[in-house]
Design a protein with these regions (language model features):
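Short capping segments at the starts of secondary-structure elements
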Residues: 16-17, 27-31
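Base-recognition residues in the alpha-helical recognition helix of bacterial helix-turn-helix
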Residues: 23, 47-49, 66
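Alpha-helical residues within the helix-turn-helix
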Residues: 37, 54-55
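Beta-hairpin "wing" of winged helix-turn-helix
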Residues: 55-64, 71
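Pre-recognition alpha-helix immediately N-terminal to the DNA-recognition helix
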Residues: 19-21
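Helix-turn-helix DNA-binding motif, specifically the short coil turn and the N-cap/start of the second
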Residues: 42-45
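Amphipathic alpha-helical dimerization/coiled-coil segments
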Residues: 1-6, 23-27, 74-94
Length: 94
């Protein structure tokens, strides 16, 4: 992945509704209708947030007739976690 990909993923998760949606998807695939039931937002607002999460690559969408099911793209997430995990943290000794 490119540096810009990590930026887009982190920006997507930096918004509270999208982070809440991501947290809901941690337990597995969900229909957009179920996400909508749990959040106090409109359908167009949900569509916007899901588009952002899908466009950055963190979430995959699969259409099944009239419903769309969303799941976390584990490969993309692992890439982001690997990027963040390569960070060396230093603590001051007191």
């Amino acid at each position: 992945m490119e540096f810009a990909d990590y930026i887009e993923m982190l920006k997507a998760l930096g918004e509270s509704t999208r982070l809440h949606i991501f947290e809901m998807l941690r337990n597995g695939t969900l229909c957009g209708c179920k996400i909508l039931e749990r959040l106090n937002i409109t359908q167009p607002t949900l569509s916007h947030h899901m588009r952002v999460l899908c466009d950055c690559g963190l979430v995959k969408a699969e259409k099944d007739w009239k419903w769309t099911y969303y799941t976390i793209d584990c490969e993309k997430l692992q890439g982001l976690l690997s990027f963040l995990g390569d960070t060396k943290c230093m603590r001051e000794k007191r």
